[in-house]
């Protein structure tokens, strides 16, 4: 890019000062004048595009950025800005090449691309982008989060902890390194250590939105909800547009109040201040849908979605809400999003919507396109098998052989307990301490009328819970031997080894149940029964685990195909792509379970 003449340089400095002060209106006016007088000033075009985008004119911003790129195809900031805009619009096929070019010179571009790769379950690519920039211990929280997320997705959480612990211990005054260690500890399911590290950073006066957010996450995992809420509010005072923090705060408020208005109150204040922030609107829609109010979720996006130039990502979010009650509208929104950008999120929505309007053949075509690029996505496999079932395709019977692939086993009492009953009694006491006796169901989860724990139980220090997960090893290995090897999505990944990938406990009260769902990022999933109501009878299905009824609308509707009657001490293992849910029951006693997912253990490759 050519050097600015002195008068233009002064004008650009004035614009930068306005942008830093947050005066977008005046900055936009001055940039428009600069571009009119200097139509070949690439950086002015880029900044003007930024102000256009901030004002909601995505199409105008893209036009300006493409003009700037035509003037100087190698100006890295333009490549990065246009790539990020396209990515935000769901046009990843166009965005990724630009961001890869920009990432060679601009760390921000590498960060944006790494976040996208992690979101798309491509952790190895994300790791290659961020690891080189995290070695010095000065990377900010966004970098560290993506680095740790990539390692965690690869099953290398402990490696992330060891890496950042070395950096923190080598430079005790480097608070960024200590914060990075806290992020790694949180991702590894070690919340007590993460809390200590985050508290140390805060005590030293390093009070950023990011450290408050890390602190809050560790407190949530430890069940310290009042302190976690305070930390999230501190975070949002510093960064009121942080959608992740709003989502976490909403979870906390909802699980203790069950009131939608209270749950979104802080987010509503942010939306009053930033009414054009699509990420905040999408967060609100997700929260409302997670609270079971899909129609309100759709309503809060309907005005934006009706606009001709609505961003594809917003159309998809609105479509996900509509999918619960109006698949035809969801289909229309998905098709609009796909016309703007061929994103996997829009295509996945379209596949589900087509099942809801009776077009199983069309849904199958979309699934096969998506599975070519993401063969292990359990939700896509569930959509594919649902389409096969509707079409009478024999492949459904092979992939969904419930009699063969759903395996109940009775757990053996671990030492030193003399029998299973005494172990389950101790386990019940340990788990009940983790459940809020007055809590509401978590947002974004399948359960209704019950509570779910917030920490990863695998990392819980309680010796009874530790004994439980050691006792799971034999039945898991029995299951892997039972299913054997093959070319289907379950068996082709079976190398005889596994690692846990999340675990939790659920306590259902009377009328409690799980909506039908799958575990999108699992491989093998589970249900272990700790305590059951006395009045559950073998003569009916109340409180049973049911398989095969989709969690989305289909035409025609599909009933459950397989039912397991639970017993205390029973562990049921099954493919994560199986639709499954719990039949409601009526009892004064609670139904207490533990669940976990496992993935194939590929960590030996990195030993």
Regions of interest found by a model, annotated:
Residues 398-490, 513:
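Non-heme Fe(II)/2-oxoglutarate
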Residues 47, 81, 112-115, 146, ...:
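Canonical tetratricopeptide repeat
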Residues 33-34, 67-68, 98-102, 132-133, ...:
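Canonical positions in the second alpha-helix
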Residues 20, 54, 88, 119, ...:
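Register position in tetratricopeptide repeats
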Residues 7, 41, 75, 106-109, ...:
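Residue-level recognition of tetratricopeptide repeat
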Residues 44, 78, 109, 143, ...:
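TPR alpha-solenoid repeat register
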Residues 458-459, 463-473, 477-573, 578, ...:
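Catalytic core of non-heme Fe(II) oxygenases with the double-stranded beta-helix
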């Amino acid at each position: 890019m050519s050097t600015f003449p002195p008068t233009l340089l002064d004008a650009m400095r004035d614009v930068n000062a306005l942008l830093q002060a947050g005066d977008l209106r005046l900055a936009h006016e001055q940039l428009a004048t600069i571009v009119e007088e200097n139509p070949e000033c690439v950086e002015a075009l880029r900044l003007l595009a930024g102000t256009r985008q901030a004002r909601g004119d995505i199409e105008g911003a893209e036009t300006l950025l493409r003009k700037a790129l035509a003037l100087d195809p190698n100006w890295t900031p333009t490549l990065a800005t246009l790539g990020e805009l396209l990515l935000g619009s769901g046009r990843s096929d166009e965005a990724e090449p630009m961001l890869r070019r920009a990432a060679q010179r601009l760390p921000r571009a590498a960060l944006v691309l790494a976040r996208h790769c992690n979101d798309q379950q491509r952790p190895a690519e994300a790791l290659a982008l961020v690891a080189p920039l995290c070695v010095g211990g000065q990377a900010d929280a966004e970098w560290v989060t993506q680095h740790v997320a990539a390692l965690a997705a690869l099953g290398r959480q402990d490696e992330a902890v060891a890496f950042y612990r070395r950096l923190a211990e080598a430079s005790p005054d480097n608070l960024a390194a200590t914060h990075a260690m806290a992020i790694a500890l949180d991702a590894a399911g070690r919340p007590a250590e993460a809390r200590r590290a985050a508290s140390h950073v805060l005590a030293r006066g390093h009070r950023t939105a990011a450290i408050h957010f890390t602190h809050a996450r560790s407190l949530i995992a430890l069940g310290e909800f009042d302190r976690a809420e305070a930390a999230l509010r501190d975070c949002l005072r510093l960064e009121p547009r942080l959608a992740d923090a709003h989502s976490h705060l909403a979870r906390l408020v909802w699980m203790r109040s069950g009131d939608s208005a209270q749950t979104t109150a802080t987010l509503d204040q942010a939306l009053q201040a930033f009414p054009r922030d699509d990420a905040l609107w999408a967060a609100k829609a997700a929260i409302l849908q997670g609270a079971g109010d899909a129609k309100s979720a759709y309503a809060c996006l309907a005005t934006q979605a009706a606009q001709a130039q609505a961003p594809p990502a917003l159309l998809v979010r609105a479509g996900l809400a509509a999918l619960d009650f109006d698949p035809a509208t969801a289909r229309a929104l998905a098709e609009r999003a796909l016309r703007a950008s061929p994103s996997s999120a829009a295509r996945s929505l379209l596949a589900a919507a087509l099942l809801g309007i009776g077009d199983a053949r069309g849904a199958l075509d979309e699934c096969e396109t998506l599975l070519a690029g993401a063969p292990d996505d359990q939700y896509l496999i569930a959509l594919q098998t649902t389409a096969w079932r509707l079409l009478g395709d024999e492949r459904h019977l092979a992939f969904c052989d419930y009699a063969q692939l759903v395996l109940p086993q009775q757990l053996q009492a671990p030492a030193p307990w003399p029998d299973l009953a005494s172990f389950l009694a101790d386990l019940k006491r340990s788990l009940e301490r983790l459940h809020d006796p007055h809590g509401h169901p978590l947002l974004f989860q399948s359960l209704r009328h019950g509570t779910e724990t917030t920490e990863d139980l695998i990392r819980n220090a309680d010796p009874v819970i530790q004994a439980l997960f050691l006792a799971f090893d034999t039945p898991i290995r029995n299951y892997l031997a039972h299913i054997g090897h093959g070319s289907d999505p379950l068996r082709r990944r079976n190398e005889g080894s596994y690692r846990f990938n999340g675990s939790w406990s659920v306590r259902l009260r009377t009328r409690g149940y799980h909506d039908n769902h799958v575990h999108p990022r699992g491989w093998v999933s589970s249900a272990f029964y700790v305590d059951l109501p006395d009045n559950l009878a073998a003569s009916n299905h109340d409180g049973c685990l049911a398989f095969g009824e989709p969690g989305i609308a289909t035409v025609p509707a599909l009933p459950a195909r397989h039912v397991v009657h639970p017993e205390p001490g029973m562990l049921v293992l099954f493919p994560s792509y199986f639709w499954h849910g719990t039949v409601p029951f009526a009892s004064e006693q609670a139904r207490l379970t533990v669940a976990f997912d496992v993935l194939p253990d590929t960590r030996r490759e990195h030993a």
